[in-house]
Design a protein with these regions (language model features):
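N-terminal alpha-helical modules
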Residues: 1-98
Length: 98
């Protein structure tokens, strides 16, 4: 995003990176579900659904609280950051100690 100089360019960069992080999250989620027994699989699915609901509500709040011309960028960065952090969290569960 260093080369992005306009709000539109920054938004595009955020969207692109969010898509990459979402693919990463989906990939590790699928890997983890195949590794888990049925009980923990269900727990992961339930937790992941709740996490998505929380992420979306939290980032919507960021947009509302920020206001102004950069509010949408703030919301996009929120989704990006939370998605990246969740992917890393699931990767740590999938491969502890790495």
């Amino acid at each position: 995003m260093d080369s992005a100089s306009s709000t539109v360019a920054m938004s595009s960069c955020i969207q692109t990176e969010t898509q990459l992080q979402d693919q990463r999250l989906n990939r590790v989620y699928q890997q983890l579900t195949t590794k888990l027994a049925p009980g923990p699989q269900k727990s992961l699915r339930d937790v992941q659904r709740k996490w998505i609901t929380y992420r979306d509500a939290n980032c919507k709040f960021h947009v509302q609280a920020s206001g102004g011309t950069l509010a949408q960028l703030e919301g996009g960065m929120c989704v990006l950051d939370m998605t990246r952090e969740r992917a890393a969290e699931l990767e740590r569960i999938l491969s502890p100690g790495q």
